[in-house]
């Protein structure tokens, strides 16, 4: 018996060692995955991906004018490119939001990021498939210093590429245009799961009072991305487009030259790499966070009546959709639910109005910001790189700060739905006033020979306007590019050739008839407009204020939306939001703004006998039309905010009171009323609780199961 004890002891020791090893392995495994079991780590990862998404989106906007000149496109054409991202996103947003809410959300987000990375890489592909850029193409009269001068004295010779060859490359250019559209569609498809699934995942795992701050940080990072995108665009456009193929030391043009084309493709390669690596982090997160990392037990349940929310939220944080079909249901039966649930959501006027208001606000951003760089170039005579740099360092950081402050105010002031909608109305009014001031901040086109004033006689009737004049008829001037020069007479000419200059040092310009012959010289660039510099500085300051205040409405709008729908429908409701944002807020505005801008064109370039890009605009009409469209959209958004406010006031069912602290006079408006109580009786001074408002329509209670929907 005693002989067996050592063996038994040895076996027990081995068993204990095995158990100890297993416990140690489990401990290591737990420690290994613990870093991905924290909602704050997920927030950082989601912010990194949204930063990369915002960067690539803004980078496209920053190089639109470069693409316009590189591929000889019109503003409406580049508007189509800008809208293609939304078309791709629009195609799948509902399906991803509906089915993705029940799937592995972090992994779906990661897959979307990889698809976006592929789209970014494809966006750069046209540069490597088309011919090299020849800035002297079609302008065979350029002198030794690259200046378009009069060919009457034979100084230009017949050197240069065959114009027929350039025109034959037109078909290839059209193919590159289609490839750019396809790449943007792919980017939109990849972006589909990032925002709706990311926002719902975060909102499911944080306390309700912290949700606005987390969402505000998330959207702040999304808007901070464009700042990086514009700065990246400013850097890339200073590099010559074919710098990797040729020796740039032999170039006789600089980034300040109107013929300069920057390396627009470089930023897409960098953005593709950022998207890919930031997407990899998402594959480490679980489908739902463990209970100890998820302090959201009070998140949505406290906001709803027992009748609406009978089933408690699972401890793992995964919301089970009351409309979710059984696992045995066919795919077709599941798809049948989508239009019915969508109709059910849209029957809620608060939900519909707040989404439409958000669409109008986004429409201003999508349309106005898409052409803001072009606007700065035309109105204030800036270069593409300078315009991008200013946008990236001023307006966009202010918008980031505005979104963050909006979320912070909602959290600190404990705003309810009524308070949030009043906050949105207030910031809308202030930002609209800023847009009105833009009508008076700009520069005139100035006198342009043959376009706005006749040659040598600024008082002749408009019927005499023609860029070709007896002074340059023998110069064989071309209109396939725009290289403006400022004459000693204070008039801008389309090029040195149109000014009749017969020397590459820009002297002896025959069309400058109002000055002595020895002073008949020109200098590169447009003639400056008086007071333009002061107007630009004022515009920049007002733009920063407008961006800061206008962006503060974004987080309150999202909070109103997710607080006025059933929690089981939260992911899908966000999907409907982003669907309508794409359908109404992102796709039409660039097309509308682009077509409106083209309508103000004074002079079009020609390419192979066809109309090319606009090279000169009526700045006054441009400014009035461009800003007026934005003001109209902002005004419509205010009407929708007001309608939402009225619905919230008149159709509420009940109030939920808690003790999170009241909102006093000194804490916000320095009045005796709070945002939540404007329009109602003042809250007594000794009242320490606030009123939470939940909106439910009498005839539109939320369905409890699939059968009630079907």
UniProtKB/Swiss-Prot annotation:
Listed InterPro entries: Kazal_dom (IPR002350), Kazal_dom_sf (IPR036058), MFS_trans_sf (IPR036259), OATP (IPR004156)
Q: Could you name the domain of life of the organism this protein comes from? A: Eukaryota
* Keyword Transcription in record: no
Gly residues bias: start-end ranges:
1-15
Annotated GO molecular function terms are: organic anion transmembrane transporter activity; prostaglandin transmembrane transporter activity; sodium-independent organic anion transmembrane transporter activity
Q: How activity is regulated? A: Stimulated by extracellular acidic pH.
The SS bond pairs are: 471-501, 477-497, 486-511
Full protein name: Solute carrier organic anion transporter family member 3A1
Q: Which organism is it from?
A: Homo sapiens
